[in-house]
Amino acid sequence: MRKVVSLMLSLVLTASLLTGCSDNKTSSNGEVIVYNWGEYIDPEVITQFEEETGIKVIYDEFETNEIMYPKVEAGASQYDVICPSDYMISKMIENDLLQEIDFSKLSNIDQIGSQYMEMSKEFDPENKYSVPYCWGTVGILYNKTMVSSAPTKWADLWNEEYKDNILMQDSVRDAFMVAQKMLGYSMNSTDKDELEQCKNKLIEQKPLVQAYVVDQVRDKMIGNEAAIGVIYSGEAIYTQRENEDLEFVIPEEGTN
C-alpha cells in the first residue's frame, strides 16, 4: 500500500512537494489525489493550482478522522496527500501509513510560525511526516435568544432545559473530550475506569440531544434549529457572521 504525505488539518499543494512523493505515480501521470475535510479548501484554489502546475487534482472529502482512517489503512484508494488531525497523525505514524516529507522541496516552509512547528512535535516528534496549516479549538456555540443564561461549563450540555435543542459532534474523539473535560480528566486518558465513566455520561445525555452532527451544526445553529451545540472555533466565526444571535464560549474546564 502506498504511503501518503500527511498534513495537519491542511493541504499544501506545490509541484515540489508532489515530486517528493517518490513512491507514488504522481509525477508520471500528472495528477495528485487529495483526501481532506469537507469545505476546507476553496475550489478556486484547486483550479489555480492546476492552472499554474499542469497537475490534475483528484479531490475527495471526509467528515471525521474515524471515517478517513480505515479507508486509508485498507488501501482502497491511493491518496497522495491527506489532512488528518493531530492525534490521528500519531496513530498513522505508529502504523507506518505515512511517508516522510522532503522539506528541502518546500520553498515556503519558513513561512510557518515556529511555535506551530513546535506544537506539532506532540504528535510528530521530529516533524518528519506533517506540516501544520491551521490551529483551532472546540467550544460551545449558543443562541442568545434560546438560552436562559450563557453556558460556562461543559455540564451545560446536560441541562434538561435544552432537551431536543442540543447538538453534539458525531465524532468519538470530540464527544469523549466533552465528557472527559467535564469530569476533570485528560482528553488523552486511556484509563478504563475514566473512559467508562465518560461513556456513561454520554449515554445519560443522549435523550437530551437533538442530533449528532458534523458540518450540519453550522447550518442548524444559523437557522435557529437548535439552542446550543459543540462546534469548532473556525466554524463558530462563520456562524456568527451569518446569525448575530450566536455566541461562542470556551468552557471553564478548558478544551482540546
Regions found by a protein language model. Name each.
Residues 1-32:
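Short, low-complexity disordered leader/linker segments with a strong preference
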Residues 24-92, 219:
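Early extracytoplasmic/lumenal segment of secretory-pathway proteins
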Residues 26, 132-134, 252-256:
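Short, flexible turn/loop "capping" segments at secondary-structure junctions
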Residues 35, 78-225:
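Extracytoplasmic ligand-binding site segments that recognize negatively charged/polar headgroups
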Residues 58-60, 210-212, 247-249:
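General small-molecule cofactor/ligand-binding pocket signal
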Residues 88-91, 227-245:
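A ligand-binding cleft/hinge motif common to bilobed small-molecule-binding domains
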Residues 174, 217-219, 228, 234-238, ...:
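Short, catalytically relevant binding-site loops at active-site mouths
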Residues 195-204, 242-256:
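Periplasmic-binding protein-like
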